[in-house]
Amino acid sequence: MIRAVVFDPRGHRFVQARTGTNDRLDLWIAFDYGGRAELADAARRLIQAGIQPDEIDEDTFARALYEPELPDPDLLIRTAGDQRISNFLLWQLAYAELVFVEKPWPDFGEEDLRAALAEYAHRERRFGGR
């Protein structure tokens, strides 16, 4: 069960050991995070670095975000039946697919993850196009 790994104090080391050589999937789990704060902080960093407005493009702005080395998510799984992104990864989710699950996060398990990934696998990715 996912909950056991995430909330166990040894979970971080366990997950690192089991996924350290993974080169196919990145999993983002964010606690106490706000997308609006991240965008405001990125703007402040660019201003403090002396970047001129005409020098700012999408790539420049993306490099000022909290985790610029991580790729944008392909999939957001939103638990607890809420159908909103709730101030989460506002910049990075631009082209992500969204899957909404009724179960709350603490009860979300491997079977639920497999179902969400299966739903995602049947999507036609358009990256903003039609």
Show which residues each predicted segment covers.
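Flexible, compositionally biased loop and terminal segments
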Residues: 1-130
